[in-house]
Structures are given as structure tokens and as C-alpha cells.
């Protein structure tokens, strides 16, 4: 399925890259972009050549650094492999946005001054929403590896996503829990000032109502209150929640797992893609992750040759197993490569 989705995405991107000049004016806002789920039979094909400046934006420092570094490291491996093939060549430069919208726009502008032609990123949702408006106005082609809110691409015909979207994560999680853990009493802890967390929570709750999943507790937090979850955990425990759904990033999740253990509370914890990377967090007690479940589009244990080659290279270079953000960064560069080839672009 992921391979098929990749083919559809590449074909949609070919349409966006067909002019290869990036100077088209934005489409009239009253006219929606073409439906990228149905690739055109007339998509251009050809042989691309030349050197393209590929920029990357993501959190290389700060609370979400595990995501950004993994995505950029994965992208770099793909760049090296593609450059070794001859033909299209990529110059790659990554900028740090600390997962902040304003900083991300500044990082994007730095790359534009460098001469960037195609953007890989931003990595996180809030930053990607901020940058997507600039990308659309500048008519720069962009592909985010992992920013999963539909707001990232809504109304923009030159911004794409590798990852699955927040609505799909919320629906998929609720469906899985209802089918595999019937009778579960669910507590939710989410960040209500973050589009990513709020978006997944909303679709999870909506789907839970449709499939008869019982939600007994909900607790919220903000960017400034993610160091103590005792109130949220106490409420969930007192109401009998035996599963805690966490549509949140790895850093608050680590605090939640640690505090739950400290209060003798041991529900099943179920995270989404933001949970990925928690095992690589400095100082994290990995025993706390025993039994934790998460929704992820990538498994480093997959037996196919290409996955194992990527995992081996990543481990050799960085001394750790790649997470889904690394895989998404890697895939993003190959999707761009295939789109450039199909469109016959010249650098």
C-alpha cells in the first residue's frame, strides 16, 4: 500500500513540477487544486538532468530534535545514493527551525537566499503550516516528510505530504482499539494548543463515538504545562481508564510514562507517530516503554531488501535504528527524484 501511495504521490508531483521553472503565479484561490488522488494519464515523462538545490527544514535542536535530525539524516542518505547513480545531482542544505513557526519561516528564507529549488520539510505540523503559505506564494515545490495536519496542504497545489494525515491517525487508532481491545475504558491526554495533537484527538473522539469506544477521561496541557501530568493521570486512574491514548510528541509522553509508574498506575499506553523516537531520547528509561503501543507507517524489522539496506546504512552512520521520521525523509528525496525524472526537469 505504501508503494502504491508513493506512485500516486509521485505522479501528482509531476504535474506540479511539469513547468520546472517554479515561476507560475498561484492559482486563483476560488479554484481548488487538481485532485491528486487521481493521477493524470497525460503526466509528462522524460529524462531529467543537472544539479538541483534541495533544502531541508526541521528541528535539529530543541524538544523535537529527534524528529528533525532523523528526517534530515534519512534525506542525506537518499541524496548520497542518488548522486552516486549519476544523472540528477542534489546539493542538500538543512536548516534548524526548533519546531517553531516563525523560526521555520526564517529557515525557509535562508534556504531561498541560498537558491533552494525544492524543499523537504518542514518536519513538524505547526512549522509546516507557517511555511506552507510562503511556499505557495513563492511557487516553490515542497514535500514534508512528516507534518501530518491536513491544514499543511489545504488549498496549496505545490505542497505535499509523505506521511499519513492526522484524521487517518485518529480514525485508525480508534478502529484498532475497538477491534482489538473490546471493552477498553479510554483516557486521553492531549495538547490543546497544538494543531497536530488537537487534530488527532478530534478525529479519534469522533470515530470512537461511531464504533462504541468508551472514553472516560480527557486531560489537556499546553506547551508551557508539559512538565507535570499528575492531575491528568489521577483523573484517568480514578475513572477506571485502562488505556491512555496519547496523540502527542515523545517528550511529554516520556514524562507521562515516568509519572504513571511513580503513582503505580499501569494502563496500556497507545501513541501515534509522535511517540516514535522516544527510545532515542537522552536519559529516557527504556523499560518504561515496555508494552507501549503506537501507530507507525514504518517498521525497521521489515524483511524486504530495501528496508534492511536503509536500516543498515543508517545504523552504520548514526549508531541507532532509524525511526519513521528517518524513513519518511529518505522516501521524500526519492519521491522528488522520481518526479523530476518523470517531468524531464533540468537543473
Protein language model annotation of sequence segments:
Residues 1-53, 84-87, 113:
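Short, low-complexity disordered leader/linker segments with a strong preference
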Residues 45, 49-51, 72-92, 209-214:
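Signal peptide-proximal N-terminal region
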Residues 48, 55-76, 95-102, 124, ...:
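Extracytoplasmic "Venus flytrap"
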Residues 56, 111-123, 143-145, 187-190, ...:
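Periplasmic-binding protein-like
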Residues 66-73, 84-153, 221-227, 254:
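Beta-alpha junction/loop-to-helix N-cap segments that form part of ligand/metal-binding clefts
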Residues 104, 162-185, 198, 226-230, ...:
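Hydrophobic alpha-helical segments within soluble ligand-binding/sensing domains
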Residues 159-220, 243:
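An alpha-beta-alpha
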Residues 257-330:
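Extracellular/periplasmic periplasmic-binding protein-like sensory domains
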Amino acid at each position: 500500500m505504501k508503494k502504491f501511495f508513493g506512485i500516486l504521490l509521485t505522479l501528482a508531483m509531476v504535474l506540479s513540477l511539469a513547468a520546472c521553472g517554479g515561476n507560475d503565479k498561484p492559482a486563483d484561490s476560488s479554484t481548488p487544486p487538481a485532485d491528486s488522488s487521481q493521477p493524470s494519464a497525460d503526466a509528462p515523462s522524460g529524462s531529467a538532468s543537472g544539479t538541483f538545490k534541495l533544502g531541508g527544514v526541521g528541528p535539529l535542536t530543541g524538544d523535537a530534535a529527534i524528529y528533525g535530525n532523523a528526517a534530515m539524516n534519512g534525506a542525506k542518505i537518499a541524496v548520497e545514493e542518488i548522486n552516486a547513480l549519476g544523472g540528477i545531482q542534489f546539493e542538500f542544505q538543512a536548516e534548524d527551525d526548533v519546531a517553531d513557526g516563525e523560526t521555520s519561516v526564517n529557515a525557509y528564507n535562508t534556504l531561498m537566499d541560498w537558491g533552494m529549488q525544492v524543499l523537504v520539510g518542514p518536519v513538524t505540523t505547526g512549522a509546516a503550516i507557517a511555511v506552507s503559505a510562503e511556499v505557495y506564494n513563492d511557487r516553490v515545490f515542497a514535500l514534508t516528510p512528516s507534518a501530518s495536519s491536513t491544514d499543511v496542504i489545504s488549498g496549496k497545489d505545490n505542497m505535499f505530504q509523505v506521511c499519513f494525515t492526522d484524521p487517518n491517525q485518529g480514525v485508525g487508532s480508534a478502529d484498532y482499539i475497538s477491534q482489538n481491545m473490546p471493552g477498553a475504558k479510554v483516557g486521553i491526554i492531549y495538547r490543546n494548543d497544538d494543531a497536530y495533537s488537537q487534530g488527532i484527538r478530534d478525529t479519534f473522539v469522533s470515530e470512537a463515538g461511531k464504533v462504541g469506544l468508551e472514553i472516560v477521561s480527557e486531560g489537556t496541557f499546553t506547551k508551557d504545562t508539559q512538565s507535570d501530568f499528575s492531575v491528568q493521570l489521577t483523573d484517568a486512574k480514578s475513572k477506571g481508564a485502562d488505556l491512555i491514548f496519547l496523540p502527542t510528541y515523545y517528550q511529554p509522553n516520556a514524562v507521562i510514562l515516568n509519572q504513571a509508574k511513580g503513582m503505580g498506575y499501569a494502563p496500556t499506553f497507545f501513541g501515534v507517530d509522535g511517540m516514535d523516537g522516544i527510545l532515542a531520547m537522552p536519559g529516557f528509561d527504556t523499560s518504561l516503554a515496555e508494552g507501549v503501543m503506537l501507530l507507525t507507517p514504518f517498521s525497521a524489522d521489515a524483511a524486504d531488501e530495501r528496508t534492511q539496506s536503509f536500516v543498515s546504512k543508517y545504523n552504520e552512520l548514526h549508531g541507532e535504528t532509524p525511526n519513521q521520521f528517518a524513513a519518511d525523509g529518505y522516501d521524500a528525496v526519492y519521491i522528488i527524484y522520481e518526479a523530476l525524472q518523470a517531468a524531464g526537469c533540468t537543473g
